[in-house]
A protein has these predicted regions:
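Conserved Radical SAM active-site core
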Residues: 1-121, 125, 134-135
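Short glycine-enriched, charge-decorated loop/helix-capping segments at active-site entrances
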Residues: 45-51, 140-145, 222-229
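Generic structural signal for well-ordered alpha-helices
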Residues: 64, 88-91, 116, 155, ...
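Active-site beta-loop-alpha junctions enriched in small/polar residues
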Residues: 80-82, 108-110, 182-184, 211-215, ...
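Short helix-capping segments at alpha-helix termini
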Residues: 94-100, 201-204, 245-246
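Non-cysteine beta-strand/loop elements that form the S-adenosyl-L-methionine
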Residues: 122-134, 207-213
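Conserved strand-turn element in the central/C-terminal portion of the radical SAM core barrel
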Residues: 142-144, 155-190, 194, 212-213, ...
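Single conserved hydrophobic/aromatic residue that forms the stacking wall/gate
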Residues: 254-262
């Protein structure tokens, strides 16, 4: 085993969805790099920076086992798209040495379905984003004009692999797909379109996680609407729409104390 990967962090992570982190924490491995270049990236240093440590596939397998020993609820592979062959090799090695907790594939949604098929049988839970239903925003903020179509194809493949969501007695997800959507300030119309599209296409086959924690990480000179957090009114407007649609399999974050009332 001599192929290397670069990871920025590996630790118990307590801030994923409740059915992923719970009280035990998710065994998150943050890979350096990302296949998207979102101008509002909330993990910019990891996604487009050069931070991190190069390790072998064998060491990656050891990290998976160490996280399991720390009672991680799962192994959470964060933005690992560009390292899939190495991840598969590390999972094979770790499973031979006793890895038996669910594997989560945590990504931005902009995936190739043929690549995802390589993960069939390795990944138990998919945790993709679905950022845009509007191509104009995909081009504007992520330079990915085909994001809506490509991400939808990816989620279709993920659902094909995982089937209906399954949970254990403690409420942790064992298998399934959770699609995340981060509300962007000033763009509730896009969020509503995302929810309608996901619910119409997948119904109860997926969980939808509606996130309001967008934070400006630096001043946007070109896209000034992104220089603020999502307001309480914007967030509640999107949540209300989700409930109007009849979405029951939805997860959402609590409103933050510093949010404005606008």
């Amino acid at each position: 085993m001599d192929q290397k990967v670069k990871i920025a962090r590996a630790a118990l992570h307590m801030w994923e969805e409740p059915c992923i982190s719970g009280t035990r924490g998710s065994g998150a491995v943050f890979f350096t790099g990302c296949n998207l270049r979102c101008c509002f990236c909330q993990n910019r240093e990891i996604a487009i920076g050069d931070s991190g440590l190069e390790i072998t596939e064998e060491r990656l397998a050891e990290i998976f086992l160490e996280l399991q020993e720390k009672d991680a609820a799962n192994i959470n592979l964060v933005t690992g798209t560009h390292y899939i062959p190495q991840i598969i090799a590390a999972l094979d090695c770790a499973k031979k040495h006793g890895l038996n907790i669910p594997v989560v594939y945590n990504c931005g949604g902009y995936e190739n379905t043929e690549t995802l098929k390589l993960l069939d049988g390795y990944v138990d839970i998919y945790l993709p984003d679905y950022k845009y239903a509007e191509s104009e925003l995909a081009v504007k903020f992520s330079h990915a004009n085909d994001y809506p179509e490509r991400a939808m194809e990816a989620v279709n493949e993920m659902v094909r692999q995982t089937g209906m969501p399954q949970f254990d007695a403690e409420g942790y997800m064992k298998r399934g797909t959770i699609v995340r959507h981060l509300i962007l300030p000033g763009h509730t119309r896009n969020s509503k379109k995302v929810l309608k599209l996901l619910y119409k296409t997948f119904g109860k086959q997926i969980y939808i996680s509606i996130m309001n924690q967008y934070t400006p990480v630096f001043e946007q000179k070109e896209y000034t609407e992104l220089n603020r957090c999502v307001t309480r009114r914007e967030y509640e407007k999107v949540l209300d729409y989700a409930f109007e649609l009849g979405i029951e399999t939805v997860s959402y974050t609590h409103l933050r104390a510093h949010e404005t009332e606008l």
